[in-house]
């Protein structure tokens, strides 16, 4: 899948789940499950409930995503 196929949206972490999975509320009110991108795991970037994040969704499955950035 090419990088241009992803949909980038912003959201807010609602709940931290096991295995670096999070429940995220999007700006439009939808709630989806997201996991942390590999580079964020490598650099030990911590994500807590209440953080604002950028995430990627694929056009094939809009109920799961990948967190790619945590806003400061």
UniProtKB/Swiss-Prot annotation:
Traced from the root, the source organism's taxonomic lineage reads:
Bacteria, Pseudomonadati, Campylobacterota, Epsilonproteobacteria, Campylobacterales
Q: What is this protein called?
A: Translation initiation factor IF-1
SMART domains for this protein: S1 (SM00316)
Secretion signal span: none
Gene designation: infA
InterPro entries named in the record = NA-bd_OB-fold, RNA-binding_domain_S1_IF1, S1_domain, TIF_IF1
As for what it does, the entry says: One of the essential components for the initiation of protein synthesis. Stabilizes the binding of IF-2 and IF-3 on the 30S subunit to which N-formylmethionyl-tRNA(fMet) subsequently binds. Helps modulate mRNA selection, yielding the 30S pre-initiation complex (PIC). Upon addition of the 50S ribosomal subunit IF-1, IF-2 and IF-3 are released leaving the mature 70S translation initiation complex.
The protein's assembly and partners: Component of the 30S ribosomal translation pre-initiation complex which assembles on the 30S ribosome in the order IF-2 and IF-3, IF-1 and N-formylmethionyl-tRNA(fMet); mRNA recruitment can occur at any time during PIC assembly.
Q: Name one GO molecular function term.
A: translation initiation factor activity
Q: Which family does it belong to?
A: Belongs to the IF-1 family.
Q: Which organism is it from?
A: Sulfurimonas denitrificans (strain ATCC 33889 / DSM 1251) (Thiomicrospira denitrificans (strain ATCC 33889 / DSM 1251))
Please tell me one Gene Ontology term that the record gives under cellular component.
cytosol
* Compartment annotation: Cytoplasm
Annotated Pfam families:
eIF-1a (PF01176)
Asked whether the keyword Zinc is assigned, the reply is: no
Q: Where is the S1-like domain?
A: 1-72
Which keywords belong to this entry?
A: Cytoplasm, Initiation factor, Protein biosynthesis, RNA-binding, rRNA-binding
